[in-house]
Amino acid sequence: MRILAIEASGPVAGCALWEDGTLTAEYSVQYKKKHSQSLVPMLSEMSGMVDLELSSIDFIAVTKGPGSFTGLRIGAATVKGLGLALDKPVLPVPTVDSLACNLYGTDRLICPLMDARRQQVYTGIYENRDGLKVLRPQCV
């Protein structure tokens, strides 16, 4: 199974290819929050590096928030366009869940934090035994 993942909810824009349980490729840029200008060229360059035909992917995943409102709209619009053009399903993923996946393989509790401003954070608590399990869903 091939999953193309797109992240644009924060200061770093990125795309990745997950293939049969392995991260095959990833590309990220943190440059002045210009996701609208960098996301599609990143996707094109990453696809070229691994000889990926976009028609061969099974799903397209995108972070759905919390995060930058503008970044979320850019990510959603990009993925919606790709999904329609390629006739592929789109999977929205909570941003905090995607952060927790950075520690995939650890046997400890995972508690990612995102700045929600106004002295608050977005967080969740996860356990990673036999797959990522949400113990406490994202909250402020």
What spans do the regions from the language model cover?
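Phosphate-handling active-site elements
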Residues: G48-S55, L84-V93
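DPxDG-like acidic metal-binding loop motif
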Residues: F59-V90
